[in-house]
Swiss-Prot record:
One of its GO terms (biological process) is L-histidine biosynthetic process. Pathway: Amino-acid biosynthesis; L-histidine biosynthesis; L-histidine from 5-phospho-alpha-D-ribose 1-diphosphate: step 6/9. PANTHER family: IMIDAZOLEGLYCEROL-PHOSPHATE DEHYDRATASE, IMIDAZOLEGLYCEROL-PHOSPHATE DEHYDRATASE HIS7. It is an enzyme of class 4 (lyase). The keyword Cytoplasm applies. This is Imidazoleglycerol-phosphate dehydratase. It comes from the Bacteria. It is found in: Cytoplasm. Its main location: cytoplasm. Belongs to the imidazoleglycerol-phosphate dehydratase family.
Length: 195
């Protein structure tokens, strides 16, 4: 994986035997440009960008083995690495939370830019696929992102039956929680440092 700093952003390239990914994450555009080739995953990524205010440009997203699991997981790894490189967690609020309704679904997201990776959710999906995306991709993406961004993320389902609504509510709340955690502030840690 290679990382290049640019004005207001970071370019990450990841090339393995399974995938080739090149993305740019920035603090300016607030939308998704390009495509992963998985329509519903693109929809979730664009939702995240819109509510977090972050811009994401996908230059290359290619599966060499045709396995979506690898593509979605490695995309999370790449995006998480870009996020970690782009932000100094000691200069932001660090904590963020949001709850977002979507029809019958209500999902809360709680974020800590702690330097300690941990991901947890209290719900499972009831179907194997949402549109063209395997539902396991949601967790694989989040784990990849969280482990490489080195942040803590909890999702809590208050209500919800429709898996499309649940996943979209979760991504909206994640974006809003990230936006709040990234607000400028002094270091918020008793240790005085975030690794």
């Amino acid at each position: 994986m290679t990382v290049e700093r640019i004005e207001n952003g970071v370019i990450v390239q990841r090339n393995t035997k399974e995938i080739e990914i090149s993305i740019t994450l920035d603090t300016v555009h607030g939308k998704l440009e390009g495509s992963t080739g998985v329509n519903f995953f693109d929809h979730l990524l664009n939702t995240f960008c819109h509510y977090s205010g972050l811009g994401l440009r996908v230059s290359t997203c290619e599966s060499k083995d045709g396995i979506l699991h690898h593509l979605i997981e490695d995309f999370g790894i790449s995006l998480g690495q870009a996020f970690r490189e782009l932000f100094d967690y000691t200069k932001v609020k660090r904590f963020g939370e949001a709850s977002v309704p979507m029809n019958e679904a209500l999902i809360g997201c709680y974020v800590d830019l702690s330097g300690r990776p941990f991901f947890q959710k209290n719900f499972e999906f009831s179907v194997e696929k949402i549109e063209d995306m395997p539902v396991e991709g949601f967790e694989e993406f989040m784990n990849g992102f969280v482990n490489h961004a080195r942040i803590t993320v909890h999702f809590f389902k208050f209500f919800g039956k429709n898996d499309h609504h649940i996943s979209e509510s979760a991504m909206k709340s994640f974006g809003l929680a990230i936006a709040r955690a990234l607000e400028r502030s002094d270091t918020r840690t008793t240790k005085g440092v975030i690794d």
